Amino acid sequence: MSDTHPTPQQEKGNYADPIETTGKESNEQTGLHRIAACIDTSGFAEKVIPHALAMAAALGSPVTFLRVVEAKPGLGFLPDPVEWDIRIREAQDEVAKLADERRQEVPNIDTQVIEGEAAEKISHWAHDHGVELTVLCTHGDSGVTEWGLGSTAQKVIDRAYGSILLIPCGSATSHVVHYRRILVPLDGSPHAESVLPLAIRLAHAQSAELIFVHVVPIPELTEVGPLENEAVELREQLIQRNERVAHEYLDRIRARVAAGLSVRTLLLRGADARTGLGRAIAEEAPDLVVLAAHGRTRRSDVPFGSVAAYLINHAVVPLLIIRRRPTHLARHDEATAHQTPLRLPTHAQ
């Protein structure tokens, strides 16, 4: 997401309509064909599973319960092979039990236990198996830190090949997730609007209210000393013009959404889109925020735009961040993803 207002071309409606109004969007449109739920041994796994299953049920996508078994940090030597095999079998049994308990809700669940460094293995496994949505918690086995994300979550998000559903560790734990309000930030760009078919499909599946939000920035004027009266008037005229255009834009988006959905629009005046959206999330208390990884700027050298990155590091509600494969990592990961993974010895050395 970027913090700019709609372009003149968008004022006139001269761009492709991204919204499918039938409410029966296919996975070809939503682009989430396979889901992986990252499940560690912490209690936060109880937060990940319901959200992964809610997505799988709404999208008709298979879901994999994925666990990575890591050697304990700081050992300085390889663990005993027998002890390691026991850990692997225990992990397989635990994940299989979790899947068995939830197959009545979503039948198409499989499980996978892999070995190695968590973030690296999750990224490579997702790439090799065509995962397009990775569901994970902001923190995991290492516990809650003073930072917005745990180290593993940060690495997985930065290296992910597809979209991310990030669950804050402080969010409520529930056996079944119901999204009553879905907030969608829009900056007027086609990139931001590309999430609309998915948001609409989720709203239909969950009978949720959609809240479309646009932040109107305060235009910057070059200042050398106090602003003259003409400059103050000019800035106010620009703000009023931008608010008018944004109102018309949100009204057009709302009018094209399928009948049968509850839709609200929210227009905020603020100097910064990041803090404006943060305030909207705090006040509206949505159950889910759906946004594009990039908005108008769509810089290819970073995995997320400034707004998405800010919301990730200040997540207080679940964030569904829709993104394509990060091009700045493509060559490196394609070269390393299929290397033979290191294995523990089968006998003492």
What are these regions (language model features)?
Residues 153-172:
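Short, structured interface segments
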Residues 137-155, 177, 288-313, 328-329:
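Glycine-rich, Arg-bearing micro-motifs that act as flexible, cationic patches
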Residues 1-30, 100-134, 255-289, 326-337, ...:
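Structural beta-alpha unit
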Residues 64-66, 110-114, 165, 211-213, ...:
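General small-molecule cofactor/ligand-binding pocket signal
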Residues 3-5, 23-79, 180-232, 254-264, ...:
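Small/aliphatic-rich secondary-structure junction motif
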Residues 137-138, 164-169, 292, 319-323:
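Short beta-strand elements of ligand-binding domains
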Residues 82-93, 232-245:
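A short acidic, glycine-rich active-site loop
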Residues 74-83, 120, 143-144, 148, ...:
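A cross-kingdom feature marking solvent-exposed beta-strand/loop segments within repeated
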